[in-house]
Amino acid sequence: SPAEKILPEDPNMLLQSVHFVGDYIFAIYMKDASSRVYQYTLDGDLVREVALPGIGTVAGFDGKDDATETFYTFSTFTAPPAVYRYDLATGESTLFARPEVKFNPDDFVTEQVFFASKDGTQVPMFLSYHKGLKKNGKNPVYLYGYGGFNAPLTPGFSPTNIAMMEQGAIYASVNLRGGNEYGEEWHKAGMLANKQNVFDDFIAAGEYLVRNKYT
């Protein structure tokens, strides 16, 4: 018999993995360089979007056919990977375990901004910093970007970045063309004859930060 399409392709998100737990399908997508998770019935009907703890990167959602719960890990720019328990029926996530750290992750914030590159292309960038930061044009910024080899740059934890943010710095992570945050066209737009786009994106990121008084 012919194959039946259960989860149609979504032009606005990249499907990264699919997991079967209990009587449900969990689809992990990447949208604007961070994770989204959707819960479906086995027939492909949407149950809900999983309410994640914030902007970050997710993994997990595995389990047995008769499971009533599942677990996933969630990491951000400002907190190390933590494990959450997810109730399949209610959609509620509860913290199950996380490493002990000598700082309060709630003291920091991450926002996502979009800016126009030289050719007008909208490029996303994550900005992480200590709460209470003043946009007065005087903050030091660590601007990091990678655009190549079809590799995405998604939220991840670094204690070094936390140390910088504790001293008043901003950690800026820009999703340059050349990665796969938006699929193959985004990848091709930053390779070979289009490589200049990668550098233009990075320069435009710095200009955005200056123009908006982050630094």
Language-model segments: residues:
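Hydrophobic beta-strand positions in blades of beta-propellers and related beta-sheet-rich domains
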Residues: 1, 25, 37-39, 70, ...
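Multi-bladed beta-propeller domains
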Residues: 1-19, 42-60, 89-107, 212
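Conserved beta-propeller blade repeats
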Residues: 9-28, 55-73, 111-112, 158-162, ...
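Structured, non-catalytic alpha/beta "coupling" segments that mediate domain-domain communication
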Residues: 67-95
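Well-ordered alpha-helical segments embedded in enzymatic catalytic cores
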Residues: 5, 20, 201-205
